[in-house]
Amino acid sequence: MSSAFDFEPMPRRASVAVDVGGVIVGGAAPVVVQSMTNTDTADIDATVAQVAALHKAGSELVRITVDRDESAAAVPKIRERLLRLGMDVPLVGDFHYIGHKLLADHPACAEALAKYRINPGNVGFKDKKDKQFAEIIEMAIRYDKPVRIGVNWGSLDQELLTRLMDENQAAGSPLTAQQVTRETIVQSALLSAELAEELGLPRNRIILSAKVSGVQDLIAVYAMLAARSDHALHLGLTEAGMGTKGIVASSASLGILMQQGIGDTIRISLTPEPGGDRTREVQVAQELLQVMGFRQFIPVVAACPGCGRTTSTVFQELAQKIQEDIRTSMPVWREKYPGVEALKVAVMGCIVNGPGESKHADIGISLPGTGETPAAPVFIDGQKAMTLRGPKIAEEFQLLVADYIEKRFGHGQAAAE
């Protein structure tokens, strides 16, 4: 039965597929998760360690800064070290100002990178702009590499902005400065892509991005870009900020765009706290795609938020422990238990929603709330399987989860089939 309130994501916008070192971006491929290092690329040990950590966390592409000769010289060594570690992760070179020179002077770097990222706003200035842009495109053609043309409103092409502002001022019904800025961002990306194609770079070697730091601006700019091209699109909110603010801003903007079918690869740009874990941005990107139903990366642990009926912290501690165990175990589980990403575990704190939510999970437990009988029913595949009692309920449930995973996704399943 259909309803006026039935709601599903819009079909993915049709885009040209781009092969980035064996990872397909666009076309019918799933939305790709990527990240960026914050190490000095010339520090090979630190960069290899961070790329490895990001890739292990689930980043399918990793971008590194290539800003000087020492960084460019380090790239092939970084690539070689990663391959020795068994990590064939595509590396994206982030170029600004002198990318044309670095690629020409360091052919091993140009070969080792899986993609070049260039910014039309600072690839060159005045009469040098088109020449230096062309030199990078020629290198991409020579080495058969894709290019992301990444416009950023913090380094916008000032000549184009000035021209559009002047044209707008002369118009009968001028747009606001914000609207002209948005149009400039879109035109900068599209004109650069057009020039790249004129220079001979195939359409299936071009990805576009148009990053701003305001949620509404980002949604507007990408909607405009999506309507006016079929290039694969890289989504990201630049300067999103730290902590909760950065997560909320990125999730709100990227979530809306992906719900509209826009976006082929995403990066969650979080400002890490001093000494913070860089892999957090990968985790947030995966969780965003998973909660929206676009991809499955890790088993889901559903847990109630707690209320006056759940003064005990047992259910919170158990939910946290299971979540941590899952995240820690996933690198092994992906190989050992194919399909385990689809697992849903429920850890509930009282009788109100506990049994119902647990029945909807693959395996769930409803712990006793305040004043309730000290017993915890366990539900497996929608049916009540047992009731746990005593001081070791949490430990016993963890063993049940491990046993369920082994039987459903391990060799036991294969033998049964």
From Swiss-Prot:
[4Fe-4S] cluster binds at C304, C307, C350, E357. Its cofactor is [4Fe-4S] cluster. Its EC number is 1.17.7.3. InterPro entries: Dihydropteroate_synth-like_sf (IPR011005), IspG_bac (IPR016425), IspG_bac-typ (IPR004588), NO2/SO3_Rdtase_4Fe4S_sf (IPR045854). It catalyses: (2E)-4-hydroxy-3-methylbut-2-enyl diphosphate + oxidized [flavodoxin] + H2O + 2 H(+) = 2-C-methyl-D-erythritol 2,4-cyclic diphosphate + reduced [flavodoxin]. It is an enzyme of class 1 (oxidoreductase). Pfam families: GcpE. Pathway: Isoprenoid biosynthesis; isopentenyl diphosphate biosynthesis via DXP pathway; isopentenyl diphosphate from 1-deoxy-D-xylulose 5-phosphate: step 5/6. GO terms for biological process: isopentenyl diphosphate biosynthetic process, methylerythritol 4-phosphate pathway; terpenoid biosynthetic process. Binds 1 [4Fe-4S] cluster. The keyword Cell division does not apply. HAMAP family: IspG (MF_00159). Converts 2C-methyl-D-erythritol 2,4-cyclodiphosphate (ME-2,4cPP) into 1-hydroxy-2-methyl-2-(E)-butenyl 4-diphosphate. Belongs to the IspG family. This is 4-hydroxy-3-methylbut-2-en-1-yl diphosphate synthase (flavodoxin). Keywords: 4Fe-4S, Iron, Iron-sulfur, Isoprene biosynthesis, Metal-binding, Oxidoreductase. NCBIfam families: ispG_gcpE (TIGR00612), PRK00366.1 (NF001540). One of its GO terms (molecular function) is 4-hydroxy-3-methylbut-2-en-1-yl diphosphate synthase activity (ferredoxin).
